[in-house]
């Protein structure tokens, strides 16, 4: 597929954008990265995602693919001949991978956000929900090195971006992920050893500083 144009509209702390960075890196797809200012969204972003007006947006030969999980599947389908395979070949296993990616999107983001945007009883409830969610994911991981088994893949890509936010979650939620969910942290550290992940995720202290600025804007500091 020569002369392809691949552009990623993204914002550096976005765990959703990190999914596409990792997937593109795993497939060794060259692309142009365009950092968005979400307070002053570019005409290109508004043109390419007129419905949600959100990042990330993958633009392939002028055509936009929105929503990060959909875009990761698109990357797998378009470049299926490039190793590694991001989704399992077995239909049942693919369905299970999609189930867990959906679970992550429906549960983890909101619980994590509440850890740094709330206080008191609401924050304590969010912490309980967040840790319970991680324990459910630990159960799905089991004793496997990755969610799909021996190989890094779809569910790992869907989840690992959140890890860059964990220092912020722990700081404001006042808990230790390693103490509560050691198997999850071991999995995350295993993922971080992959070049595609290490280069796609920002440093946790940098994300913490970003969250502190947001908290000040929201009047939480």
Swiss-Prot record:
Identify the domain of life: Eukaryota
Which CDD domains does its entry note? GST_C_Tau (cd03185), GST_N_Tau (cd03058)
Q: Where is the GST C-terminal domain?
A: 90-214
Q: Where is the GST N-terminal domain?
A: 4-83
Alphabetical UniProt keywords:
Auxin signaling pathway, Transferase
Induction text: By auxin.
Q: Which reaction does it catalyse?
A: RX + glutathione = an S-substituted glutathione + a halide anion + H(+)
What Pfam families does the annotation carry? GST_C (PF00043), GST_N (PF02798)
Q: What GO cellular-component annotations does this UniProt entry give?
A: cytoplasm
Q: Please provide, alphabetically and separated by semicolons, the GO molecular function terms listed in this UniProt record.
A: glutathione transferase activity
Kindly state the tissue distribution recorded for this protein: Root tip-specific expression.
InterPro entries noted in UniProt = Glutathione-S-Trfase_C-like, Glutathione-S-Trfase_C_sf, Glutathione_S-Trfase_N, GST_C, GST_C_Tau, Omega/Tau-like, Thioredoxin-like_sf
Residue positions binding glutathione: 14, 41, 55, 67-68
Gene Ontology terms: biological process: auxin-activated signaling pathway; glutathione metabolic process
User: EC number(s)?
Assistant: 2.5.1.18
Residues in coiled coil:
none
Family, per the entry? Belongs to the GST superfamily. HSP26 family.
For this entry, the protein name equals: Probable glutathione S-transferase
Q: Which organism is it from?
A: Nicotiana tabacum (Common tobacco)
